[in-house]
């Protein structure tokens, strides 16, 4: 099993992962199902992970196996506050938007079951399509840190949003190693089927 990051982007998987280790769409779907079931058991116990990302899962796209690791950031929502708020790119926008507030500030959004669900949706999207749902062509600020905070937080906008193309990926700016997965026009998220489309719509649009 390998760190999930290797299978999260077109550039990484196309340049560094041997063809015989990439698995199939079906095996990666099984991988995602196992992660989702693991999170469901965690939530059923009244816990939240708070830092689910490709760095905190080990995956095997060949067999479709997966396991969640680095669960030292587990929280009990409302009782045991988190020590971490998550990994950039997987933190729910509402959590990132209030990260500067103190833990006891009533306006601060803390990691909980629903923010885990956002991270899970991002993880499934990246594993199946090899691109990030919020990493589009829009530059929100010339300062890299501010740009990230806006991209994943206050200005988070799905790259395949049906009515707002502000953050659409510019295919002519993609490198050869990022194709075809990096171009949503060639591989739209709808290829994942109606059930996952509904999940992605709820996570990134609704």
Per-range role (PLM):
Residues 1-31, 80, 85:
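Conserved structural core of kinase catalytic domains
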Residues 95-114:
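Conserved end of the kinase activation segment
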Residues 133-206:
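Helical subdomain adjoining the active site within ATP-dependent kinase catalytic cores
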Residues 30, 39, 43-61:
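Catalytic-loop of the protein kinase fold
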Residues 55-100:
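Activation segment/activation loop of eukaryotic-type protein kinase catalytic domains
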Residues 117-127:
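A conserved short alpha-helix in the C-terminal lobe
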Residues 35-42, 124:
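Conserved hydrophobic alpha-helix
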Residues 130:
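Flexible loop/cap residues within protein kinase catalytic domains
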């Amino acid at each position: 099993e390998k760190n999930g990051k290797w299978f999260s982007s077109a550039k990484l998987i196309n340049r560094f992962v041997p063809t015989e280790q990439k698995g199939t769409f079906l095996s990666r779907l099984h991988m995602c199902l196992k992660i989702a079931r693991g999170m469901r058991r965690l939530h059923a116990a009244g816990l939240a992970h708070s830092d689910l990302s490709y760095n905190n899962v080990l995956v095997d796209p060949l067999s479709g196996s997966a396991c969640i690791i680095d669960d030292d950031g587990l929280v009990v929502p409302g009782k045991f506050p988190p020590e971490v708020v998550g990994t950039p790119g997987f933190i729910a926008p509402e959590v990132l938007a209030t990260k500067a507030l103190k833990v006891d500030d009533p306006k601060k959004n803390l990691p909980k079951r629903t923010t885990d669900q956002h991270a899970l949706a991002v993880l499934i999207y990246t594993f199946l399509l090899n691109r990030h749902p919020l990493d589009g062509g829009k530059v929100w600020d010339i300062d890299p840190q501010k740009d990230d905070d806006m991209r994943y937080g206050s200005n988070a906008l799905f790259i395949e949003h049906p009515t707002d193309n502000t953050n659409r990926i510019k295919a002519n700016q993609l490198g050869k190693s990022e194709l075809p997965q990096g171009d949503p026009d060639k591989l739209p998220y709808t290829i994942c089927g109606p059930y996952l489309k509904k999940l992605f719509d709820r996570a990134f649009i609704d």
